[in-house]
């Protein structure tokens, strides 16, 4: 993780001259740099060079390196900030990520950033660089050049009190460290991360920041009649686990917010076997659980004034002679029976018991579940654009949508309706785990299935199948695991439910 620090703009040019690279911003169409005078007599020279490049006019994320401004003068990198009226937290995040990528490509060890913005935006520029600096390279015997990290230190010069900016950044950094943890979990191969080892990793990592963690085995789940969850893992040599995380930062009398995650550490599809091509991606079928771990760690790390509980069901969906069969009937913790027609629609079975358990044990004020639940949501919304949102509560759904827009982790609400609910009625049990009546609406019928295990509690289901893994990378996330949901839920809690 890159080291980010802050100084005041009044520190002067002498401090800037000690760095390898100076990064300065310019808004689209502007005739001056956003340095607030920090570069003193060099502005005109830089602008003369900038104006000489007709292809560069300050559009968002445009980059122009300037070498040899003067003898022994640092390399100057001018970055376009786009239109000034559009520059906000999310743009600042992306600018920070672009700066990191460009400087790392240039193989420089350190740099200073001079962009004349307020404290919050300055902190987010640093945060964007931090988020983009994630690397999962532990399994390389020799680091290849493209996987090397060169940039280790960034200093941002702010017009505001650097202590104020640092305080804002430290809260963001706590969130960022949690996102890195979530990304790392999702990136781990399934022979390393499986229910037993994953549960132990959660315990070790979250105990460090004050989260109370309990790990429950299969005997405990059998005693609680969690046969929907256990049925998913019965074809695997890896034993299923239930992990409960608690953070009590609010009033003792206050009911907690609950986060529930699907943790299928590898999904073969079971007897309803997936095609071999692309099955390697199914190590990230536990991304919902990683997001729950991430938000619980974030709340504890920044000492959030809220009570929260996280519950994740951890299973491996594999195939052997004891594997669950299409047409099996299982009894869930709720007492409702489920006809399992497709063993590859397993995540909803895990969540069915995890949701019911959460309500029974903790009486939460609301529940949010996260799951890479359906490929259909990717068909509907695409990759890395919007997660699907389903809810029985309009107010909470709208709060999450606002939090998503503000954090950049956007949500699109999809319907719940009796017309869809009846599609999962079974002829021999209370319900079946897929619709067999025609085609389409698979994400909706999956959400309808989950709703049958919500007992009078405000609830939101987030289908993050298209958001958990980025095959190309973004300004703030390299190719791979995204940690989607942590920033969204942290904003949701701090904006609407935390005591300030």
Swiss-Prot record:
GO terms for biological process: proteolysis. The keyword Membrane does not apply. Belongs to the peptidase M17 family. The lineage of its organism: Bacteria, Pseudomonadati, Pseudomonadota, Alphaproteobacteria, Rickettsiales. Coiled coil: none annotated. This is Probable cytosol aminopeptidase. One of its GO terms (molecular function) is metalloaminopeptidase activity. One of its GO terms (cellular component) is cytoplasm. Keywords: Aminopeptidase, Cytoplasm, Hydrolase, Manganese, Metal-binding, Protease. Presumably involved in the processing and regular turnover of intracellular proteins. Catalyzes the removal of unsubstituted N-terminal amino acids from various peptides. Binds 2 manganese ions per subunit. It catalyses: Release of an N-terminal amino acid, Xaa-|-Yaa-, in which Xaa is preferably Leu, but may be other amino acids including Pro although not Arg or Lys, and Yaa may be Pro. Amino acid amides and methyl esters are also readily hydrolyzed, but rates on arylamides are exceedingly low; Release of an N-terminal amino acid, preferentially leucine, but not glutamic or aspartic acids. Mn(2+) 2 binds at residues 262, 267, 285, 346. It is found in: Cytoplasm. CDD domains: Peptidase_M17. The active site is at residues 274, 348. Pfam families: Peptidase_M17 (PF00883), Peptidase_M17_N (PF02789). PROSITE patterns: CYTOSOL_AP. Its cofactor is Mn(2+). It comes from the Bacteria. The keyword Plastid does not apply. Mn(2+) 1 binds at residues 267, 344, 346. Its EC number is 3.4.11.1, 3.4.11.10.
């Amino acid at each position: 993780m890159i080291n980010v620090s802050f100084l005041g703009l009044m520190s002067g040019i002498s401090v800037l001259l000690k760095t390898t690279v100076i990064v300065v911003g310019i808004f689209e169409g502007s005739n001056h740099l956003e340095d607030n005078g920090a570069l003193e007599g060099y502005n005109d020279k830089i602008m003369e060079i900038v104006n000489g490049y007709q292809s560069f006019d300050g559009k968002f994320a445009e980059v122009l390196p300037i070498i040899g401004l003067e003898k022994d003068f640092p390399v100057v990198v001018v970055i376009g900030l786009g239109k000034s009226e559009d520059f906000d937290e999310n743009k600042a995040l992306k600018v920070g990520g672009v700066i990191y990528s460009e400087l790392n490509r240039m193989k420089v060890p350190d740099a200073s950033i001079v962009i004349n913005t307020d404290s919050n935006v300055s902190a987010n520029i640093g945060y964007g660089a931090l988020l983009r600096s994630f690397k999962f390279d532990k399994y390389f015997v020799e680091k290849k050049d493209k996987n090397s990290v060169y940039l280790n230190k960034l200093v941002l010069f702010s017009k505001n009190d650097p202590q104020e900016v640092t305080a804002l950044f430290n809260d963001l950094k706590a969130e960022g460290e949690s996102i890195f943890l979530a990304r790392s979990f999702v990136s781990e191969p399934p022979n390393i991360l499986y229910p037993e080892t994953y549960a132990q990793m959660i315990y070790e990592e979250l105990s460090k920041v004050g989260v109370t963690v309990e790990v429950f085995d299969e005997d405990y789940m059998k005693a609680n009649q969690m046969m929907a969850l256990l049925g998913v893992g019965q074809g695997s040599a890896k034993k299923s686990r239930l992990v409960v995380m608690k953070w009590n930062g609010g009033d003792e009398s206050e009911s907690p917010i609950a986060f529930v995650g699907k943790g299928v550490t590898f999904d073969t599809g079971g007897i309803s076997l997936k095609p071999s091509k692309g099955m390697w991606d199914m190590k990230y079928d536990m991304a919902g659980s990683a997001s729950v771990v991430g938000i619980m760690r974030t709340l504890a790390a920044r000492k959030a004034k809220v009570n929260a509980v996280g519950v994740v069901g951890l299973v491996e969906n594999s195939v052997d002679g004891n594997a669950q069969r299409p047409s099996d009937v299982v009894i869930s913790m709720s007492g409702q029976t489920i006809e399992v027609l497709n063993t590859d629609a397993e995540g909803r079975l895990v969540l069915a018991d995890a949701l019911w358990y959460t309500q029974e044990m903790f009486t939460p004020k609301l529940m949010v579940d996260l799951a890479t639940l359906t490929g259909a949501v990717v068909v509907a919304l695409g990759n890395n654009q919007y997660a699907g949102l389903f809810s029985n509560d309009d107010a909470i759904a709208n709060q999450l949508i606002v939090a998503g827009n503000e954090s950049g982790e956007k949500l699109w609400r999809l319907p719940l309706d009796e017309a869809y609910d009846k599609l999962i009625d079974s002829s021999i049990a209370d319900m079946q785990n897929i619709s067999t009546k025609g085609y389409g609406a698979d994400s909706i019928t999956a959400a309808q299935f989950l709703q049958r295990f919500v007992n009078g509690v405000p609830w939101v289901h987030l289908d993050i199948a298209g958001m958990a893994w980025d095959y190309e990378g973004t300004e703030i996330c390299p190719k791979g695991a995204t940690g989607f949901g942590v920033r969204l839920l942290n904003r949701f809690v701090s904006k609407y439910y935390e005591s300030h």
